[in-house]
Amino acid sequence: MHRLISRLRAFFQRKADPKEAKEERQKLLEDATSLQNKQGVVAGSCSNYDCMTKHTRSSADVETGDNPLKAEPNLPAAVEEQSPRGLNAVTVDNDHDEEPSESHMRILLASITSLVGDADYNGHGFSFSLDIACKDFKPYNGDLVEIEFSDEQDTQSRRAILVKPLKHCHLNEVRVTRTDGSTGVLEDTIFFTLDSLKLPSGYVPQPDDVVNVVAVQSMQSNYFWRAVAMTPVQVL
C-alpha cells in the first residue's frame, strides 16, 4: 500500500512524455486493481466479535499471477494481544499450518457458538463431530478456532476435517485468583471452567494455588483467554 501511494505521488510530481505517462498510469491501475481484489477476496469480518475474519487464507483456485493470495486476519484489538495482559507467556503459538495441499480445501476462522451433543456449531452455521475433527482439543463456547474443511461437490455441503484453537500460549506459575463453582479465574485475566479443563487426577483448583497453564484465545465475558490445561506448582 505505501509503495503504491509513493508511486502515485511521484507520478503526479514529475513530468514525463505521453507514452511513458500512459504506461505508468496503466501499471498503477493494475496494481490498484490487484490490491482491491486481494482485499475483497481475503478480508471480511462479522460484527460484535461473533466470528473471526472469514477466508483469510484463500484457496488455490483464487490467484493473482502465479502466487496464491494470502493475508493476515483482521483481528479485534483485544484479540491481537500476544499473551494475557500483564502476564509473560513462555511461548505463544499461532496454530496456522501451511496452506492445505488439496485445491478443494478451505480454511475458516470462526468462533464456537453452541455445543449440542457431540456436534459443535460455529458462527458460520455448520456442525462437526468432536471426536473426528477436534482430536486433543475440546472446544468451548466462545473459543476462537481455525476450521479446515472441504466442500462436498456431490452434496454442496461442508465437511469439517480439523478444528484447532486460533492461538494458544503457555504460562508458568500463575495464581488462581478466584473460583465460583465449576468456573474460576487466573490472575484476574484467564477464565477457566472445570467442564473443559485438563487437570491431574484428583486436583481441583483453589484460590491462591500457583499453576502452569495452557490457554487459548476465547471470547468470554470480560476475558479473552481460556485455560484448557492446568498443572499445580504450589498448593496452599
Swiss-Prot record:
List keywords of the entry alphabetically: Cell projection, Cilium, Cytoplasm, Cytoplasmic vesicle, Developmental protein, Flagellum
Q: What is its main location?
A: cytoplasm
Region of interest called Disordered, as start-end residue ranges on this chain: 57-84
User: Which domain of life does the UniProt lineage start with?
Assistant: Eukaryota
Expression by tissue, per the entry, reads:
Expressed in spermatozoa (at protein level).
Summary of the knockout phenotype: Knockout mice do not exhibit any gross abnormalities and survive to adulthood. Homozygous females are fertile, while the numbers of both litters and pups progressively decrease in hemizygous males over time. Males are totally infertile around 32 weeks of age.
Transmembrane stretches in the record are none
Query: Which subcellular locations apply to this protein?
Result: Cytoplasm; Cytoplasmic vesicle, Secretory vesicle, Acrosome; Cell projection, Cilium, Flagellum
Asked if Nucleotide-binding is a keyword of the record, the answer is no
Q: Which GO terms describe its cellular component?
A: acrosomal vesicle; cytoplasm; sperm flagellum
> Which GO terms are recorded in the biological process aspect for this UniProt protein?
spermatogenesis
Q: What does this chain do? A: Plays a role in spermatogenesis, possibly acting in the regulation of the autophagy pathway.
Assembly and interactions?
Answer: Interacts with GABARAP; this interaction may be important for GABARAP protein stability. Interacts with LAMP2; this interaction may be important for LAMP2 protein stability.
The protein, known as:
Cancer/testis antigen 55
Source organism of this protein record: Mus musculus (Mouse)
